[in-house]
Amino acid sequence: MPMRQLLLLRHAKSSWDDPALDDFDRPLAERGLKAAKLMGRELAARDWLPDQVLVSSALRTRDTWRLVAAELPAHPRVVFAEALYEASAADILSQIRKVDPSSGCLVVLGHNPGLEDLAKQLAGSGSEAKAHKRLEEKFPTAALARFVFDSEWSGLSVARLTHCLRPKDLG
């Protein structure tokens, strides 16, 4: 079975400027716009190119994906999933397990605390020590955790964390 890649990407920094806006409808802040583009360029440079993407349907996650996608050479299948908004780690994992079995590289673009909780839960033995330490320290906005594993999506429970990238480490 080929090696699969799972990329857990937290949405970029959002704006709290308009207190009247519902949380679901908050746009990206200026810093978030830059970070999303930076992470997109990093995915392209490392050749971590998704063939499928699950994106929370909140505005800040959709905007993050739009900016990331603009930096990629190809356009993967994208599913906007309301189930990823305010999702727990278990909710996110259940969405991942339903992914098309032919998919080799999946990006899940969502929110904390569920995304960070899932990343910590998935990181099994054989994970890179530096990446694990970063993940334990903080999983800020626009952070990316990359996992590899060689089972089916439907059976995912543990994987090898290879990288934990944060915009401040790249920019």
Where do the model's predicted regions map?
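Active-site-proximal alpha-helix that buttresses catalytic centers in soluble enzyme cores
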Residues: 2-87, 124-128, 139, 171
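Glycine-rich phosphate-binding loop signature in dinucleotide/nucleotide-binding domains
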Residues: 46-48, 98-104
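Domain-level recognition of soluble alpha/beta enzyme cores
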Residues: 123-160
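Short phosphate-binding loop-to-helix
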Residues: 84-101
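Residue-level preference for the first positions of well-ordered beta-strands
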Residues: 6, 105-107, 144
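Short, solvent-exposed aromatic-acidic interface loops
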Residues: 160-171
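A glycine-rich beta-strand to alpha-helix segment
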Residues: 104-123
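Hydrophobic packing residues within well-ordered alpha-helices of enzyme cores
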Residues: 64-68, 92, 118-119
